[in-house]
């Protein structure tokens, strides 16, 4: 099997994934998964598509992650891994879609408007 690549985005985070056959090692920006994401919850989020299909020990994953925060990066990585797994085997797509791993979350930060301190907040109104 050749190297399969995919892209995942969430908020400002971008994850570029390169999947090849191996032993289940996930390397993010030349660091181990547990070193990059110390939180077990974020590690679980990243591994969700692999665990759903039962292929966690079958592929080595190299990741280039940039932008955003920890949560956004982990969810961008989850989407990228799911897309790469579908490129490898298209029959897995319905199983991943039913769990919501194939859907790009469109929510992002709303822009600040002029004449207001924040996106929705207005300056205090004084009647007199």
UniProtKB/Swiss-Prot annotation:
Tell me where on the tree of life, at the top rank, the source sits.
Bacteria
Composition bias, Basic and acidic residues: 97-113
Ranges of biased composition (kind: Basic residues): 114-128
What cellular-component terms does GO give this entry? cytosolic small ribosomal subunit
Q: Where are the transmembrane segments?
A: none
Disordered, as annotated region: 97-128
Q: Could you provide one GO biological process annotation from this protein's UniProt record? A: translation
Any one Gene Ontology MF annotation carried by this entry is: structural constituent of ribosome
One Pfam family for this entry, by name? Ribosomal_S9
Does the UniProt entry include the keyword Ribosomal protein?
Answer: yes
> What keywords sit in the KW lines?
Ribonucleoprotein, Ribosomal protein
Q: What family name appears in the similarity comment?
A: Belongs to the universal ribosomal protein uS9 family.
Q: What is this protein called?
A: Small ribosomal subunit protein uS9
Protein source organism: Bacteroides fragilis (strain ATCC 25285 / DSM 2151 / CCUG 4856 / JCM 11019 / LMG 10263 / NCTC 9343 / Onslow / VPI 2553 / EN-2)
């Amino acid at each position: 099997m050749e190297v399969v690549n995919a892209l995942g985005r969430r908020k400002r985070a971008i994850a570029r994934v390169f999947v090849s056959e191996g032993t289940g090692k996930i390397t993010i920006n030349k660091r181990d998964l547990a070193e990059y994401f110390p939180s077990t919850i974020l590690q679980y989020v990243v591994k969700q598509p692999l665990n759903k299909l039962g292929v966690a020990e079958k592929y080595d994953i190299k990741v280039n992650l940039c932008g955003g925060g920890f949560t956004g990066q982990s969810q961008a990585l989850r989407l990228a891994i799911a897309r790469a797994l579908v490129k490898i085997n298209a029959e897995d797509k319905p199983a991943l879609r039913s769990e919501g791993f194939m859907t790009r979350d469109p929510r992002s930060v709303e822009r600040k408007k002029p004449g207001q301190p924040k996106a929705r907040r207005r300056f205090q109104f004084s009647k007199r």
